[in-house]
Amino acid sequence: MQASDIQPRTVPRHLAIIMDGNNRWARREGLPGVAGHRAGAEVVREIVSACESRGIRYLTLFAFSSENWGRPRAEVRALLALLSRYLRNEVAKLASDGVRLRVIGRRDRFSPRLQRLIAKAEAETEAGERATLTLALDYGGRWDVAQVTKSIARDVLAGALRLDEVDEEAIAQRLATADLPDPDLCIRTAGETRISNFLLWQFAYAEFWFTEVLWPDFDETVLDLALADYAVRERRFGVRPLLHQY
């Protein structure tokens, strides 16, 4: 199935991607690990454009997890340097294409310079209405739930929220993704079949598609395979379809 064969109504409104396999790609090619991350960053540019052209309104990329701080220091520095370069080089194109960039996750552990760069990129693309690209940086699903819990506790103690008002909606409104619809589809590359602490609450009814393809090898063809598979799935959201009554 080609991109032109996928009907707009079957395209996921919100696509999340767990980008995995950069280091394995570099080892396969006999290159240092940072080369894999550079190659992966190039793929991000292509996939952002591909999603926009296919009518996917929201794209969320797991770019730097809370657990990534535990990687070798040199690798962390390389990852953050690539992130800084992406923010500097891609913002103008995102803005001209009408793509809003937003970042979710902790920012306080990043350098003040990177924090300013993130804020600047968000401000310069704020008017984008065609699509929203969300980068999950220093993000963890458990952190997200914990910060919601703290927010609710503060509001209850302050009298701004009654205990009987704490429901799913109250939680959803305080998540890092509060202004986004829940993901419809999550793609994970490199043969891994776990969600690795990503969007734990938000994935409640998401569809998942796993591929052996390493992220630097991911392209529009693989994306279309995922979209074609998603297009024929029946999403039930936990509800069994009613049988026809005669």
Regions found by a protein language model. Name each.
Residues 1-246:
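Flexible, compositionally biased loop and terminal segments
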